[in-house]
Amino acid sequence: MAKAATTLKTASVLAFERKLANSDALMYAGNWAQQDNWTAIAIQEKSVRGTISNRLKNALTSDPAKLDAEIQKANLQKVDVAALPFGADTLKIVFTLRVLGNLAQPSVCNDQDYQTALGDIITGYAQEQGFSTLAARYAENIANGRFLWRNRVGAEAIRVVVTKKGERSWEFNGEDYSLRQFSQPAGDLAALTQAIEKGLAGDASALFTVEAYVQLGNGQEVFPSQELVLDEKARNGKSKILYQVNDVAAIHSQKIGNALRTIDDWYPAADEAGPIAVEPYGSVTSRGKAYRQPREKMDFYTLLDNWVIKGDVPMPEQQHYVIATLIRGGVFGEKGE
């Protein structure tokens, strides 16, 4: 057995499909006191004359006359915006989430020996640790409305309703849960955790509809995802293009998924930075930082290879991280020289 372990190599082709399969999130407007009448939020176009506020060259800032001439230039912009109507004070965001099992079976693997060894490790984790820890964190990120992103900031009230198809629903006050630390699930949160856990374990079908209600105030701006448009012709002169689905303002499925998997507080600087999205190198692009550096042997690939190839079992917290990365999905094969 030991000899087999030493000859085992990482598969050159290895991929996992994501096990938290969420949809885009659509955005609607209504009123907190009357939550049975919702209208789709449309993207509007706005043309504005902005000010010159970017950092200027020293040659301009050191010469008052040149600076005055520069700031007098018109900074004309055409942008997309989205907002609640003045007759509505509440934003409703809706998406669906399908939780898939069969994690031990990669979608692609070109090395049968490696696939068997990796499958044994995943099965062993499921038997010894179970998916309860990960499921509880995914559930809490639904309950706290983390997926609302900027739409959550400054809200008067947040209500999240989760419905499991054909069964029951759970209701949460988003402000009861922290974004910085995770709690011990109880009540409805424990029930939602159990439903997600069964989905990850492959014991039951798990399809959820998530509806979040955010009281912001009449006419307040809301924040769909922003599109990355590389073709200048497609931009049509706009400096900001917002995402929409069938003329309804929306948030990208990738952004929703990023929020749901923001459960990693097992990395070295977690006390300072808080939970981050599960990523192979702990990358947070908004901060320009990778929190799981290979030199510290805390990145996904080092932990996975040591676990599968060398038989070095990580600490339980890092086991959760490795399994969560596989749940995230991706292409993890060893790159050729």
UniProtKB/Swiss-Prot annotation:
Keywords: Antiviral defense. InterPro entries: CRISPR-assoc_prot_Csy3. One of its GO terms (biological process) is defense response to virus. The keyword Oxidoreductase does not apply. If the spacer DNA has a perfect match in the chromosome then toxicity results. Suppression of the toxic effects occurs via mutations in the CRISPR/Cas machinery, or via target deletion, which might contribute to genome plasticity. This CRISPR/Cas system can be used to remove genomic islands, and possibly other genomic regions. Induction: Expressed in late exponential phase (other phases not tested); part of a large cas-CRISPR3 polycistronic operon. It comes from the Bacteria. Belongs to the CRISPR-associated Csy3 family. CRISPR (clustered regularly interspaced short palindromic repeat) is an adaptive immune system that provides protection against mobile genetic elements (viruses, transposable elements and conjugative plasmids). CRISPR clusters contain sequences complementary to antecedent mobile elements and target invading nucleic acids. CRISPR clusters are transcribed and processed into CRISPR RNA (crRNA). Probable multimer. Part of the probable Csy ribonucleoprotein complex with cys1, cys2, csy3, cas6f and crRNA. This is CRISPR-associated protein Csy3. It comes from Pectobacterium atrosepticum (strain SCRI 1043 / ATCC BAA-672). The lineage of its organism: Bacteria, Pseudomonadati, Pseudomonadota, Gammaproteobacteria, Enterobacterales. The gene is csy3.
